[in-house]
């Protein structure tokens, strides 16, 4: 492989392995095209909402205008594409935002995307979906105080709005 692809070989191997993992986690979001055209990093894939969860949430938000304020690679937006009146996505990371734009285009979907800090709202009347970072130093965090940004500042910033916050739970036996 290295002989054929040179310095790109490790990236191609990593992409192939990630897409295999993504097929199980995200495959049902894109039944016609699969995830073979999607872009993500290992960390982004780990943090991405699993397809069944994203679809369940999308059904609960059907008929609403929804702003995914931490859209990352676009998983929630992909689930919302046929159910929300309008879906808006934002993320502070320009690379993940570019991945979201690419991934949604692979599904034939256009979405309103912009670079923004979750603590600086860019919509007014939309339901806000927030998935704060729950990893640091490569480890998953389960205490609300460890989320970045913290839930206190998030809820203060979106006071009076309908907000959906994704919170992880520790595996059984861990607290």
Report residues per predicted region:
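SAM-dependent transferase fold signal centered on methyltransferase-like domains
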Residues: 1-175
